[in-house]
From Swiss-Prot:
The gene is ttcA. It comes from the Bacteria. HAMAP family: TtcA. NCBIfam families: PRK10696.1. This is tRNA-cytidine(32) 2-sulfurtransferase. It comes from Marinomonas sp. (strain MWYL1). GO terms for molecular function: 4 iron, 4 sulfur cluster binding; ATP binding; magnesium ion binding; sulfurtransferase activity; tRNA binding.
Length: 279
């Protein structure tokens, strides 16, 4: 991390950012009961700004939390060409954090199965998820923490609407399909711009994201650009949209599984009241 002892302005800004990220992360954890006493939290560390920030903020909160929980960092090395294997172990050893490097050659599997030019996202995601879930069970982790933030959640909402025909996003807390694992997203309330600024000041050893150029990544970038443009033109729109997914009114949507539209009946009592008023 850069030496801020002779740069009071930058030090003040870093402290403000850290306090804001701690407050929002703590609020998300409390709102969704993400971490409980005795939990073993497996923090998934990719080497990007989000997961580095998540690890640091969780360790901050751990030091002052009214409950006891442990943290173990896990990196999934998918054997992508050019991945710098030494960076994360060196960083985590210096930090004094318990960690595991999980080596799974999912890259070769995807390349072998998926035809050239076809999207690899679905298979890659399933293999990655399966590896992490399996390892969480192996080490007895009770929670799996991912570094998705508020902007990721909104981008996923629009991706699912535009390209999947579904009104869904990334929940801050999720039970896996088999009911064995609970996935949490402690940064759910945090802005990407705050995380970006914080990571720059902390000088994390960022591992460049080896984007595969898939259709899903291209679509996500289009949605990201759209949301950033909206926020620039109408400041506060992002906050409003995030508030919207916390204030859902099923009776004003069109999903018959969420609301019994067919069963709606006029209320005789309402007519009686109207008659009384008209008299």
């Amino acid at each position: 991390m850069m030496d801020l002892s002779t740069r009071p302005k930058e030090k003040l800004e870093l402290n403000k950012l850290q306090k804001r990220l701690r407050r929002l992360t703590g609020q998300a954890i409390a709102d969704f009961n993400m971490i409980e006493d005795g939990d073993k939290v497996m923090v998934c560390l990719s080497g990007g700004k989000d997961s580095y920030t998540m690890l640091e903020i969780l360790r901050n909160l751990q030091a002052s939390a009214p409950i006891n929980f442990s943290i173990v960092a896990v990196n999934l090395d998918q054997k992508q060409p050019g991945f710098p294997e030494h960076i994360l172990p060196a960083y985590l050893e210096e930090l004094g954090v318990d960690f595991h490097i999980l080596e799974r050659d999912t890259y070769s599997i995807v390349k072998e199965i998926v035809p050239e030019g076809k999207t690899t996202c679905g298979l890659c995601s399933r293999l990655r998820r399966g590896s992490l879930y399996g390892f969480a069970e192996e080490i007895g982790a009770t929670k799996i923490a991912l570094g998705h933030h508020r902007d990721d959640i909104l981008e996923t909402l629009f991706l699912n609407m535009f390209f999947g025909g579904k009104l869904k996003s990334m929940p801050p807390k999720l039970l896996s399909d088999d009911g064995k694992h609970i996935v949490i997203r402690p940064l759910a309330y945090c802005k990407e711009e705050d995380i970006e600024a914080f990571s720059v000041m902390k000088e994390y050893p960022i591992i460049p994201c080896n984007l595969c150029g898939s259709q899903e990544n291209l679509q996500r970038q289009v949605v990201k650009d759209m949301l950033q443009k909206w926020e620039k033109e109408f400041p506060g729109r992002t906050e409003s949209m995030f508030s919207a997914i916390q204030n859902v009114v099923p009776s004003h949507l069109a999903d018959t599984k969420l609301f019994d539209f067919k069963g709606l009946k006029q209320s005789p009592a309402a007519f009686d009241r109207l008659n009384i008023i008209s008299l």
